[in-house]
Each structure stands twice: as C-alpha cells, then as structure tokens.
C-alpha cells in the first residue's frame, strides 16, 4: 500500500468511525509531547503516565496538547503504560458525552475549551471603517516591526552638534 493511500485510510478511520471505549480501555487527556512518538497523558482520576503512538498513526495524525485519546493499557511498561488506540475529535467527544461514556472530570475541561474557542474568535465590526475615518496617518502602532534589524536612535542633540560642525568646517 502506498503512503498516500495508507494516510487516506488512517484519516478516514479516525474521522469517520465512532468509537466507544471497552472495559479495559480508558479516555485520557494529552498534557504534553516529550517527543519520540510519546505523549504524557492524564486520566480522569488524575494519574499521569506516558503513552506510545502506534506506527499507523505516525506522520499521519497529529496530536496536540489538550486532545483526548482512547488508550489500551500495556502491562509490561514502567514509564510507558499504554498505547493509543483512537484519537478523539470534537464530534466524538460530543457523542460520548450524549451517550454517557464521558468521564465527569473531563466534562468540565471540554466545556472550558469550547467556551475559550468561542471567546477567542474575533468579532467582526458591524460596519467597516473607511481608511480615512477614525485613524490618523501619524499612528504607526499597527505597522509590522522587524525585530531582526538593529534600531538606530539618533538624539536631537547629536544631530544639532553634527550640523554645527559641518557649518564650521565649510
């Protein structure tokens, strides 16, 4: 199977399939990604541990901090105690909440994230302002400042002294 078709099937599986955790599986929240396809997660009970990403998800599905996962426990692991079996998107979270499979500890977190997403979206003004209205041409505070260049500040005293020296020399 080519890489493109593999990616297509993995993405369709994650986005389309509805997954309910079995008895041995659990829902966890991603806290951070230390690297090497490992993710630090927290359970609804507050237990923290590392989970590994299976090779079928690597370079196909991206997991970020705050995402929710369904994991299978690994008995022989000391630090890595589970393996990711499913990545939950927003639609999966909503359906699990409606069905009652969602942990109570995470329901508050999911609500806060939804509220933050709504608040972070900028509201558009009712009427667009024309370029001449309400703004002065002297106000450059909204311009991009390139921080990679040195800032040369010339004081007025130095420039007056330079002008006087040039006049005396001429």
Swiss-Prot record:
Cellular compartments per GO CC: cytosol; nucleoplasm
Annotated spans, Disordered: 112-170
Modified residues (Phosphothreonine): 33
UniProtKB keywords: Nucleus, Phosphoprotein, RNA-binding
Bias (Acidic residues): 155-170
GO molecular-function term, one example from the UniProt record: RNA binding
Subcellular location: Nucleus
Claim: Ribonucleoprotein is one of the keywords in the record: no
Motif (Nuclear localization signal): 6-12, 56-65
S1-like domain span: 5-89
InterPro entries: EIF1AD, NA-bd_OB-fold, RNA-binding_domain_S1_IF1, TIF_eIF-1A
Function comment: Plays a role into cellular response to oxidative stress. Decreases cell proliferation.
Protein name according to UniProt: Probable RNA-binding protein EIF1AD
Organism: Mus musculus (Mouse)
């Amino acid at each position: 199977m080519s890489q493109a078709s593999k990616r297509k099937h993995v993405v369709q599986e994650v986005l389309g399939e509805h997954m309910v955790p079995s008895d041995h599986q659990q829902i966890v929240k991603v806290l951070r990604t230390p690297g090497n396809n490992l993710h630090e997660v927290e359970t609804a009970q507050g237990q923290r541990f590392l989970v590994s990403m299976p090779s079928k998800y690597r370079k196909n599905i991206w997991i970020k901090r705050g995402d929710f996962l369904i994991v299978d426990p690994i008995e022989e692991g000391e630090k890595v105690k589970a393996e990711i079996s499913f990545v939950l998107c927003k639609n999966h979270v909503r359906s699990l909440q409606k069905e009652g499979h969602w942990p109570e500890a995470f329901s508050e977190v999911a609500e806060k994230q939804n509220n933050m997403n709504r608040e972070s979206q900028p509201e558009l003004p009712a009427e667009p302002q024309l370029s001449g209205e309400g703004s002065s041409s002297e106000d450059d505070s909204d311009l991009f400042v390139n921080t990679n260049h040195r800032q040369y500040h010339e004081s007025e005293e130095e420039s007056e002294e330079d002008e006087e020296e040039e006049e005396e020399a001429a």
